[in-house]
């Protein structure tokens, strides 16, 4: 929002300069974006009157004038402006005047005629870009008066960024209130006395959508002169706020908008059929707006209509059919309070953003409408003449915003700001802000003013108190906090520890969106039900993820497209699985997932280029699982997953419960996702692993360990993990280690079979094992394998 500093000082005039005022406004939360003078630097320009105006004898486009500037004689000045005429009051740069750009006025001859000055346009004085003609001043402008003084050009425009919660500052009155509070200065409101009705004319007004329009005021003003010129003082105030003067009626409504923050609209009363109806639009209904464009409306759009058609979009844009034009004599002034939710988003839907919609979307003071319509009526009558009828008020108190009582506790105030502000200061600040305050024991009960929608809870009052008290007035104090030993279960395995291990192994952590493309997700989890968002950011982000693989694989593709072929990444996050038994019907599981692809090692002269395989990822995953202390209970079992290669994947089980998957991405899925080369993934349900087994101290055997190797032949479909597990189970008391060190297929082994070479480590903590005992345990293992898996010792 942009406004004139002098206009603000008409409302409140603290004894501080422009820089201090701008800094104060910024510190109050209304960030000042810029302060600029309203005119260029010049002097020697005064009010004059064109007494004579004749055609230049030697130039068709020049005129020779005699100008009275209040001196002893008339000045001869040559002027080329098309609007120069006898009797016009003008801005005259006299000899010796210095204009913007260090341009000095001197006596000269133009085409043979003497010129003792210059009649100035707005652009020549650095006031605006208007160079279409010389400045036309009011007829009562006093001759010889310095133009800077007459037009009050020793002024600045201040532009501020108003946050959405401070809609009350979208008018001079709101900024003035804040400045008055900060400086403990009185607020000097211009007189806005009620206008006495001189005619009885009214217009029927019906509000069918009371929830969207709790208050609608109208007033008939008859017999106006719509072509009456807008006073220069009003034009200047509008210009300094960035508003172009259009006609007197529109200028008045814009003036009230800027002054009070209340949007208004003027209808041509004679073009309204029957009366005003405030209603919701009919689906597909059209209205031609003031800019000539046609808008097709939805049923959730509030409109101002007459008895036959829509006249405009409520709170956003008026319609062409009922707009004021050069022949208008009778107008209906509209001043309403619209519920912000009934306006929000409607302007953007039609590609519009108006000053009215900007304010209505954020909220207008529901108690402001009477003051605004009285102010507009008085200005309109003073400028355009005419007679005003009574105010037509259609209000629904039940749907108007209610002011809640907010309790502010002393303990909360002190705790949040870390500083004690005296009780009387707190009470004074709240009252100066416009609150109705009741003081209690170590608390205040405050009712926020109608213009402050953002004051709803206790924290809002704390913010207001410290804002007005001044952040700079809060002393720097060392932070004081009690040191309390945090409780941490030894069995808790921190994800931070897991992430550190993966980082050490060359993985990089990524964070991907929980919103994924439902089509891609169906490729990874065909047939799985996912939660679809009713209002997604985009179609490609309209489903909640069922696993972390969607985001991770998309990240791999992104990197491969940028010549990053060796990728090792992981992510921790939630998946969202529809579950009727879960709270709100959605189960949220914390997952740990990772992806690798490309070469096993970074390029190096001493290392061969080898592509990662299943066992690279399995080894990394086992290192992570070992942190849980449950690696001995983990099994990798062949199990189908539609996203994984059927021959290079496995389900991960903790005892008898499946906790994840690992494997190579299915070749068909690789093709559809545009993955380049073999890609391997894993995913674990972390909640089932977060409780680690705390290592138990035990005696280290002083007696020698014994290793025995066996090679058994089993069917191809027998998992090696089951063989190792069986050996551990059989030799539970003496077998302390089992390891698979070779797998052989080929000569000497029948087709459909494989040879597994297993080492058994046998040891006792109390004595040295005898050879007979060792042989018996090995034989027991072989017998168990033969019985369960039909295994045989390889010759």
Curated annotation (Swiss-Prot):
Co-factor requirement: Mg(2+)
A GO CC term assigned to this protein in UniProt: phenylalanine-tRNA ligase complex
Q: How is the cofactor bound?
A: Binds 2 magnesium ions per tetramer.
Give, as one word, the top-level EC class: ligase
Q: Which residues form the FDX-ACB domain?
A: 701-794
- Tell me a GO biological process for this protein: phenylalanyl-tRNA aminoacylation
Alphabetically list the UniProt keywords: Aminoacyl-tRNA synthetase, ATP-binding, Cytoplasm, Ligase, Magnesium, Metal-binding, Nucleotide-binding, Protein biosynthesis, RNA-binding, tRNA-binding
Q: Please name the GO terms that the record assigns under molecular function.
A: ATP binding; magnesium ion binding; phenylalanine-tRNA ligase activity; tRNA binding
Query: What does the subunit comment say?
Result: Tetramer of two alpha and two beta subunits.
Task: Kindly provide the name given to this protein in its UniProt entry.
Answer: Phenylalanine--tRNA ligase beta subunit
Q: Which organism is it from?
A: Salmonella paratyphi A (strain ATCC 9150 / SARB42)
